[in-house]
Amino acid sequence: MFKVFPFTAIGHPHAITAPRLVVKMSAIATKNAVESLVVKPPAHPTYDLKGVIQLALSEDAGDLGDVTCKATIPVVMESEAHFLAKEDGIVAGIALAEMIFAEVDPSLKMEWSISDGDKVHKGLKFGKVQGKAHSIVIAERVVLNFMQRMSGIATLTKAMADAAHPATILETRKTAPGLRLVDKWAVLIGGGKNHRMGLFDMVMIKDNHISAAGGVSKALNSVDQYLEQNKLQMGVEVETRTIAEVLEVLDYASRTKTSLTRIMLDNMVVPLSDGDIEVSMLNEAVDLINGRFETEASGNVTLETVHKIGQTGVTYISSGALTHSVKALDISLKIDTELALEVGRRTKRA
């Protein structure tokens, strides 16, 4: 049975009739809608979902709007369209779809039989949108682009999060340019956790930083001094690639007051020729750290290997594959043909 999920509509009177689609969105309405969500999108200091939706709609509309709709679909035609899952998976992007539909035409009404994060099976009709057919078709591709990508990310995240237990699965910064908020939101919907949003919200000392600084200890010392001088408090993670580097980090931390919070254990998972993995180095590193810092395994993480990695005792497992090469979930949105024809006959356009 379908149930209606309330959503604050965002007006855009020219989305259908104006020759040029200039997207505007109320920041207050967007904030209120986001705050009501069960799984809220992550925050960013310089842009938000408003900006993401603006760009997606405006790049589709160009300077003339939907010329095909103008030629073939009467503006007054009313219809409804159904969301259909064409394969099994976890659906994500329902809340974002509502924001997009409301931006194109606030009179559109949406009903859903599921929520973000729920599982769907092939052939399930899980939602519908009712209103002007013109508006539905204008929003269709943008809505599906987001929903299919987000659902693909959420589906893989759910599978990896379940397999990784008791470790927590994280994504990385390997997201689609301009879509990091959306990609990371999908990870949350799928049951994962977010790594740092960008370069600004966590110190992450990687191999290039270590090489430029002259070693692990020097890099850590520089970070500690920088944070203290600038009165900054944030998480600090350092990448290690060998047991020797792990020991160097632990030695530094034993001698120095440090802001270090997490140690990355990079590529300590060794793939074997038979498809299995060797995790003895990872086990040794986790034992040496012994809970003094959070640990994060990275490298050679797949759906097939993540369970064994999770059993080593690491706190986190990060995987770029969650977002950088995810397979979109096949979802369609089809207008009710009979209803459209009936209205079309009345308007002499069918």
Curated annotation (Swiss-Prot):
GO biological process terms held by the UniProt record: alkaloid metabolic process; NAD biosynthetic process; nicotine biosynthetic process; quinolinate catabolic process
Record: residues binding substrate: R141, T172, R173, K174, R196, K206, E239, D266, S298, G299, N300, S319, G320, A321
SUPFAM superfamilies per UniProt: Nicotinate/Quinolinate PRTase C-terminal domain-like, Nicotinate/Quinolinate PRTase N-terminal domain-like
Pathway assigned in UniProt: Alkaloid biosynthesis; nicotine biosynthesis; Cofactor biosynthesis; NAD(+) biosynthesis; nicotinate D-ribonucleotide from quinolinate: step 1/1
Keywords: Alkaloid metabolism, Glycosyltransferase, Pyridine nucleotide biosynthesis, Transferase
Zinc is among the record's keywords: no
Alphabetical list of Pfam families matching this protein: QRPTase_C, QRPTase_N
Descriptive protein name: Quinolinate phosphoribosyltransferase [decarboxylating] 1
Provenance organism: Nicotiana glauca (Glaucous tobacco)
Lineage start: Eukaryota, Viridiplantae, Streptophyta, Embryophyta, Tracheophyta
Recorded name of the encoding gene: QPT1
